[in-house]
Design a protein with these regions (language model features):
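S-adenosyl-L-methionine-dependent methyltransferase catalytic module, highlighting the catalytic core
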Residues: 86-91, 101-224
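Conserved SAM-binding loop
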Residues: 1-120, 135-147, 218-225
Length: 227
């Protein structure tokens, strides 16, 4: 989406550090924040010099006070896990370049597909609810509104993963038959790898259309701050 156009990347909730490693090897200036160093230390220890362990609210304030700016700020499956996402988004504005990009990926919950599955009784409950892990839930429209209230405009939304389409088929409905879950996941990976092999550009466009329709088990929004 932005390869070779922007060169400083902050990954909030960087986990094992794979995104840092990927862009570092392409020559980007990278930095990551996470509560724990376990993941990055055990998977990409060479990225530890570009890593800070701690509360992202505290660390973002330090960066803003130091005048640090980034071309890209990435929150991959972390915004919906945060207790204070509005504060985090406000702090991100202070460290994001005026023409910078904020990338956010979250689980697509209360999606149009999930609502349809409930309506047609293909699932028996709101299976996506997670009392401990998700303080916030977003679908496409909810994510766009949430970011707009924080002062960001949406440039694009992408839907990722076809796995929940399996719930439409009684033979592959992994909510009712958990034994098929592994094979559904493997099929999803194979399909996406095949699509990318055929055309990365067309695969990206398919994901964009999925996101536009509010489909996909996960959604990724591309935002810029209003200036």
């Amino acid at each position: 989406i932005f390869l070779h156009k922007l060169n400083t990347i902050l990954d909030i909730g960087c986990g094992e550090g794979y995104l840092l490693k990927y862009f570092y090897e392409y020559g980007y200036e990278v930095f990551g924040i996470d509560f724990s160093r376990h993941g990055i230390a055990n998977n990409n220890p060479d990225m530890l010099p570009f890593f800070c362990q701690g509360d992202c609210v505290v660390e973002l304030k330090k960066m803003a006070d130091a005048g640090k700016k980034f071309d890209v700020v990435n929150l991959d499956q972390s915004l919906d896990m945060m207790l204070e996402p509005k504060i985090v988004l406000s702090l991100c504005k202070n460290i994001l370049e005026d023409d910078g990009v904020l990338m956010i990926k979250v689980a697509n919950n209360y999606s149009v597909l999930q609502e349809y599955l409930l309506k047609t009784q293909k699932v028996d409950s709101e299976f996506w609810l997670d009392e401990e892990g998700h303080p916030y839930y977003f679908n496409k429209d909810g994510l766009i509104r949430f970011l707009a209230e924080a002062g960001y405009r949406c440039e694009n939304v992408y839907g990722e993963s076809f796995i929940d389409f399996n719930l439409l088929n009684e033979k592959t409905n992994y909510c009712r038959d958990k034994s098929v879950g592994k094979s559904c996941y493997q099929a999803r990976i194979e399909l996406e790898l095949l699509m990318e092999h055929l055309s990365e550009e067309k695969t990206l466009e398919i994901f964009r259309l999925l996101g536009e329709m509010g489909l996909g088990r996960e959604i990724m929004g591309v935002f810029k701050k209003e200036v």
